[in-house]
Amino acid sequence: MLKHHLTAPLIAAFALTASAAGARDNLQIAGSSTVLPYATIVAEAFGENFEFPTPVVEGGGSGAGRKKLCEGLGEATIDIANSSSRIKQSDIDLCNANGVTDLMEVRIGFDGIVFASDINGPDFALTPTDVFGALSAQVAKDGALMANAAKTWADVNAALPAQDILAFIPGTKHGTREVFDVKVLEAGCKETGAYDLFLAGSSGADDAAKEKDAVAACHATRTDGMSVDIDGDYTETLSRIAANASAIGVFGLSFYENNTDKLKVATMNGIAPSVESISKGEYPVSRPLYFYVKKAHIGVIPGLKEYVSFFVSDDMAGPGGALADYGLVPDPELAATQAAVEAETVMAPLK
C-alpha cells in the first residue's frame, strides 16, 4: 500500500519511466563529496541489514546534486540529494518549476572545514584575515583597495612561513565553497576593512544591492594561479598537494582524519579542528550537513523511508554511532530530526 497520495502527473511520471526502463528498486542518491563517505557507510549497512538493495550513492557536489534532485519526479530522477550547505531559494524555485514541491530537509550532523598541507611541511596557524589576505583578488591597504600582490604567506603575516602561496580550494559547485566563502573569506574581508571599502565603492541602486556587491567582491579570489579551484572531490585536492608539497588544501574534517599520515592540519584562530572543538562550538569554520528527500517518492521507491530513518538513527548518526567514528559531529537536536522524519515533515519556506 502506498504511504503517499499520488497526483495524476506523478502517476504518469512513474508509469512512463517504469514502462521505459522497468521498475527501479534501488535508491538513487547524489551530491556532496563531504556527505558522500557518510552516505556510503549508511548505504552499505542498509543493504546488509534490510530487505532492500544497497542504494546507489554518487558524488558530484552539493549544487549539482540539488540540481539533479529538482529535475522532476519519477523513477528516472534521483530520490535524495546530499548537501554540505543548505538548499538555496534558486534550487527550490527550480524544484517547483519541475513539479518537485514537497522536500524533506534532513540535518545529519556537523562537519568542519580544515586547511591542511603536506605532512612534512611547516606548521600553519591561520586566521580568516590571513586566508583573505593570501587568496583574495583585492585587499585593503592604507585605506584603499589594491590588487593582491602577496607572494608568500609571510608577506601576509610575518608569523607565517615564508612559503609561496598556493592554495587548492573547492570549486563553486561544492557546498564546501559556500561555507569557505562566508566563514573564511567574508569574515577576513570584514576584519581587514576591505568590506567597508567595497561597500563604499559599489554603484548599487540601494543598500541591498551595495551589500550584495561588497559580499561578491569579498568572495572573489585571485586569478594569478595562487588560488586554484578544484571541481573534483577531496582526493583530487590531496593528489595536488602530493605533487606540490608547498601547497595548502581545503578539506572536510572527516577526510583529513582519514589521511593524517599524509596531511598536517592548520589551526584557525588558534583552535585545532576536531570533533570535540566543533561540538563545543570552539572551531570557527564548521557547518551542518544535510540531505534532501523527495517526499513524493516515499512509498513508491522501495526502502526510501526506511533508509532515511536508518541514516538518522542513534546507531548511525548518534553519539557513539557508526558515523561518529568517521568524523561526523553528532547533532544535539537529532531526536527532533528523527521525529520529523517519522512524520515525513516537509521543510518550511526559507527565511
Positions of predicted regions on the chain:
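Gram-negative bacterial Sec-dependent N-terminal signal peptides
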Residues: 1-22
